[in-house]
Amino acid sequence: MKFNKVKLVIHACVLLFIIISIALIFHRLQTKTHSIDPIHKETKLSDNEKYLVDRNKEKVAPSKLKEVYNSKDPKYKKIDKYLQSSLFNGSVAIYENGKLKMSKGYGYQDFEKGIKNTPNTMFLIGSAQKFSTGLLLKQLEEEHKININDPVSKYLPWFKTSKPIPLKDLMLHQSGLYKYKSSKDYKNLDQAVKAIQKRGIDPKKYKKHMYNDGNYLVLAKVIEEVTGKSYAENYYTKIGDPLKLQHTAFYDEQPFKKYLAKGYAYNSTGLSFLRPNILDQYYGAGNLYMTPTDMGKLITQIQQYKLFSPKITNPLLHEFGTKKYPDEYRYGFYAKPTLNRLNGGFFGQVFTVYYNDKYVVVLALNVKGNNEVRIKHIYNDILKQNKPYNTKGVIVQ
């Protein structure tokens, strides 16, 4: 009997120990959950993702584009020969006087599967997407929904910083915000922008030019806040659909998956695939895929005043060194003395555009390399366009 009592006491103690242990573990888990920074919490589908899922429910893959190339035209024959001899791996599109004159693929879209680049291949345009963000920003200005000189805190009241940051400084990359550091922990644009606000301003860089993806991520969030719509919806309803850019898509749009180029880079063991694993946080600054022909189509339509009036378009495209456009860089692109330029490089893919009133040259590659050397040779040496185009300090009407 005595032995049974001892046994019962031991069992009771063990049971009590188990209950206390479970309670402590539960308490620690609860504390840990509540202490997680909201930036790092897993979220449901973002507004951008919801919009794209709904949009693509009934959408099918776009119609195939045909190769455009006239071997009888000496300059285009020379461009083709040059791209082949330089082992170019990508696609090219060239518009001359608003007409598509060349559209051709070289090398492979997917080396593992042996899928070749064609005019249908869509490339990750990286920072060239800032041009689209700049256009959306400009549209909101012209609609009097924003003032480019207002502080960002007027539109995002929670975006508090040690010094005021006008939207214009974000657009010109002179906000002073610390360089954006992407993280796999950030699952959407909101989390990325909260992280940017949390890091704040580098006093040494305030009001000084420093290229920073973070500036355009914040602008993308401002666009969302002002319109009450996701960045993706703004892009499609204000640019993509009106201008019929049917071979452009965000990184996660299923109907376009088979056309998306994979990016590569050479390392000590050979060619390596660079997986783009942070694009969910890059709305506004680097998660758009385009064919070179669609980018050329976008630019030619802007030149033809299909997005803005001549009064807005001409200064936007040509002025620099003036009060309104003090720098070569504005709204995601450069206006330089001999050309206008867009460029983006992300996860082994490089997307570069040179253009003037006669030619739009778009060169996209998906094996990391120097795209600038090739496009300069095509634009300056073959097409002979190294001549005055924009004049510093001249106000354009």
UniProtKB/Swiss-Prot annotation:
<dbReference type="GO" id="GO:0016787">
    <property type="term" value="F:hydrolase activity"/>
</dbReference>
<keyword id="KW-0378">Hydrolase</keyword>
<feature type="signal peptide">
    <location>
        <begin position="1"/>
        <end position="23"/>
    </location>
</feature>
<dbReference type="InterPro" id="IPR012338">
    <property type="entry name" value="Beta-lactam/transpept-like"/>
</dbReference>
<keyword id="KW-0732">Signal</keyword>
<dbReference type="InterPro" id="IPR001466">
    <property type="entry name" value="Beta-lactam-related"/>
</dbReference>
<dbReference type="InterPro" id="IPR050491">
    <property type="entry name" value="Bact_CellWall_Synth/Modif"/>
</dbReference>
<keyword id="KW-1003">Cell membrane</keyword>
<keyword id="KW-0472">Membrane</keyword>
<dbReference type="Pfam" id="PF00144">
    <property type="entry name" value="Beta-lactamase"/>
</dbReference>
<dbReference type="GO" id="GO:0005886">
    <property type="term" value="C:plasma membrane"/>
</dbReference>
<keyword id="KW-0046">Antibiotic resistance</keyword>
<dbReference type="GO" id="GO:0071555">
    <property type="term" value="P:cell wall organization"/>
</dbReference>
<dbReference type="GO" id="GO:0046677">
    <property type="term" value="P:response to antibiotic"/>
</dbReference>
<comment type="function">
    <text>Catalyzes the liberation of D-alanyl moieties present on wall teichoic acid (WTA) and lipoteichoic acid (LTA). Affects the methicillin resistance level and autolysis in the presence of Triton X-100 as well as the cell wall structure.</text>
</comment>
<keyword id="KW-0961">Cell wall biogenesis/degradation</keyword>
<protein>
    <recommendedName>
        <fullName>Teichoic acid D-alanine hydrolase</fullName>
        <ecNumber>3.1.1.103</ecNumber>
    </recommendedName>
</protein>
